[in-house]
Amino acid sequence: MRFSPTRHGALIGVLALALTACSTAAPETADSTGEQASVQFEDNNGTHTLSTPLTSVVATDNRTFETLASWGIELSAAAVALMPSTISYTEDDSIIDLGLHSEPNLESVVAVQPDVIINGQRFAQFHDDFAKLVPDAVIVELDPREGEPFDAELKRQTTVLGEIFGKQAEAEKLNADFDAAIERVNAAYSADDSVMAVITSGGEIGYSAPSVGRTLGPLFDIFDFTAALDVSESSEDHQGDDISVEAIAASNPDWILVMDRDAAILADDPTYVQGSEVLENSEALSGVTAVQNGNLVYMPADTYTNEGIQTYTEFFNALADAMEAKN
């Protein structure tokens, strides 16, 4: 549910599973020189084998961009238009841009003849199109699977990417940092405190429901948060569900977690107003415990177009910092 605050608004604005056999790679074979010749792994669609070294890599899943960039993986084509400016690939003119999911330039993938396409998230719908355009490419999809724990699914994705690109140690470090951040929040959070998650966008505040809400919903399962409000028939809408500011005020959450959706896509727009202004300048919310006590915690600005494991690690640590400071 989404509501428009009484004062001028702002713009603002994740599901994972347990590591299973799906994330275990088979031993890599080697050629006569001792170099890796192939790697076998499992994704959402089954078992795949890739010949190595890889000569052409394409990426369209925004949850993977930061990881691939941090590992120095060269891309021949990617959904560059979808990337936040925080991703180094946006400065590499040699990468062919496949565009946004709303207006994709899929045919351009043919020119780079990819060995592998890391596909998913907003581009998941184009799996079959890629398969027809470049039938020899291995299409990897590691989106969090429905019904599986979101935190474990983020780690599974990282683990499999590590297997594909020979970055197992780096993947283990990312997962360990993620786990450590989760432990910090678990240690700092009190079940007596109620929590609400919202997405701000276009001057309105959207409700991100426990479990199912976009980006922040899974946190209620990861941390067993006590929900300040639980509305039936909630959705995964990218702007959150409609809700009245009065309903939020009446639920009186002790903590409000915020994704500023527009921070990722409209930060340079002169009409953009930060999500903090939407919430903290709302007269209707001025009496809410979370607002009075400064217990509003914001996700990183690039969250809406990033959403990778690093995004959550950073946010969990910020949340832990805030909660520890209140203890």
List PLM regions with ranges.
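Bacterial Sec-exported substrate-binding components of ABC uptake systems
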Residues: R2-R63, Q168-V198, M259-T271, D321-N327
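Short helix-initiation/N-cap motifs at beta->coil->alpha
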Residues: D43-N45, L98-N105, S234-I243
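A short, structured surface patch at a secondary-structure boundary
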Residues: T55-S108, V116, R122
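Alpha-helical, coiled-coil/dimerization segments enriched in small aliphatic residues
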Residues: L82-T86, A209-Q239, D302
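Proline-aspartate-enriched helix->loop->beta-strand connector
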Residues: Q113-N119, P135, I248, N252-L257
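Extracytoplasmic substrate-binding proteins
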Residues: P135-G203, N295, D302-N327
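Ligand-binding pocket segment of bilobal, Venus flytrap-like solute-binding proteins
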Residues: Y189, G202-S208, D221, F225, ...
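Structured C-terminal subdomain patch of bacterial secreted/periplasmic proteins
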Residues: D254-N327
